[in-house]
């Protein structure tokens, strides 16, 4: 018999354990994080690279884009909404992957902890916010989003710093050019005038004659509101979710009063607002503008798939060459205008569908009537009587 000790082999994935938890997790942690975020935190532990048993920390070797697109299959905004509380309560950290060959902003990796910041005493206590995402979280991409640009080239880093007055004057000139360049134009679509959204021509949309009675008025109202919008544009990067769907902001003080905002929230369906907040990470000011524009357009109920569709349309447009030359001035306004257009198009398609169904039903009824007629026996009683008289002898 061999008396040599048996070497410990590597554990299979199904043998590994999740973090051991105490009652405080059920009593406090889940409620503060939310069930979806808490579940994601558990899944993070299963994605850690455990090849090195002497590793310093548990790192997930995947980029953010890989996680939310390929692994989770959710939107970028929802992913940031889920990881934000984990970072604030100290259950994860975010680092840049320095070994990446990417020339632009390095991809970010997640470090996951079994308890807040790996401080053992916090394992048995209720969660406490240890940091604030908006104030404390810093990354290269986030800072670029705030300053409105990309990393400067090395040869330009030595340029002398400009005085604040010079920068302000240059920015003002730029703003005036933008206002002139982004003038609104009217385009005719199927016999009625439709306001150009955000200063660029609308795409060709087939709209039937069946439209809402207030269709053109809605666009006029929204266009008039938009003329008061400032054109102060700040460019965000591709990685960070800031305040609006794709990052630029506008001067919000010129748009709606507090009384307008109050009336708008009273008009909008409460369930729609709840769904908006749960599925998208818009900041307070953008949400208020969006709700007010919906109120002006007479839309009390909307759905998450409609908002997601418009966010994608905004992102696709701004990535295009046309979008860079002629940027959107107010995304909230653009989103509502697109929503109105989509609904009008859907109504016309629905009416056409109903009309075709009605024609099809009438044709089927006609065919059934013809088939029913062919089944009824037909007797020519005149011919039958003539045959009977021919077989009788004439009477004298």
UniProtKB/Swiss-Prot annotation:
Q: What keywords does the record list, in alphabetical order?
A: DNA replication, Plasmid
Q: Which domain of life is it from?
A: Bacteria
Q: Where is this region: Disordered?
A: 141-170, 356-396
What are the GO BP annotations of this UniProt entry? DNA replication
Q: Indicate, by first and last residue, each region the UniProt record lists as having compositional bias (Basic and acidic residues).
A: 154-168
**Name of the protein this chain belongs to:** Protein RepA
């Amino acid at each position: 018999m061999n008396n040599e000790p048996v070497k410990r082999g590597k554990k299979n994935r199904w043998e590994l354990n999740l973090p051991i938890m105490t009652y405080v997790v059920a009593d406090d942690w889940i409620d503060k994080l939310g069930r979806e975020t808490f579940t994601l935190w558990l899944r993070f532990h299963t994605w850690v690279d455990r090849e090195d048993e002497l590793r310093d920390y548990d790192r997930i070797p995947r980029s953010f884009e890989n996680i939310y697109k390929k692994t989770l299959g959710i939107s970028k905004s929802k992913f940031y909404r889920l990881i934000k509380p984990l970072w604030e309560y100290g259950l994860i950290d975010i680092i840049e992957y320095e070994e990446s060959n990417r020339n632009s902003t390095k991809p970010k990796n997640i470090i996951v902890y079994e308890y807040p910041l790996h401080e053992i005493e916090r394992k048995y206590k209720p969660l406490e916010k240890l940091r604030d995402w908006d104030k404390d979280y810093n990354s290269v991409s986030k800072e670029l989003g705030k300053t409105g640009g990309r990393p400067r080239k090395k040869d330009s880093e030595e340029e002398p710093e400009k005085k604040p007055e010079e920068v302000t004057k240059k920015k003002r000139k730029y703003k005036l050019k933008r206002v002139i360049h982004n003038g609104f134009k009217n385009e005719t679509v199927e016999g009625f005038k439709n306001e150009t959204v955000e200063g660029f021509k609308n795409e060709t949309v087939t709209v039937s004659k069946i439209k809402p009675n207030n269709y053109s008025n809605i666009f006029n109202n929204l266009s008039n509101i938009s003329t008061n919008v400032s054109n102060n544009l700040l460019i965000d990067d591709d990685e960070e979710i800031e305040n609006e769907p794709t990052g630029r902001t506008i001067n919000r003080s010129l748009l709606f009063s507090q009384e307008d905002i109050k009336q708008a929230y009273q008009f909008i369906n409460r369930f729609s607002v709840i769904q908006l907040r749960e599925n998208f990470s818009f900041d307070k000011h953008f949400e208020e503008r969006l709700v007010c524009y919906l109120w002006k357009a007479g839309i009390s109920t909307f759905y998450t798939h409609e908002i997601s569709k418009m966010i994608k349309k905004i992102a696709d447009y701004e990535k295009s060459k046309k979008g860079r030359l002629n940027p959107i001035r107010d995304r909230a306004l653009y989103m509502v205008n697109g929503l109105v257009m989509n609904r009008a198009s859907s109504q016309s398609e629905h009416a056409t569908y109903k009309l075709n169904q009605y024609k099809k039903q009438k044709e089927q009824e006609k065919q059934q009537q013809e088939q029913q007629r062919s089944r009824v026996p037909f007797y020519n009683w005149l011919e039958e009587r003539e045959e009977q008289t021919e077989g009788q002898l004439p009477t004298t």
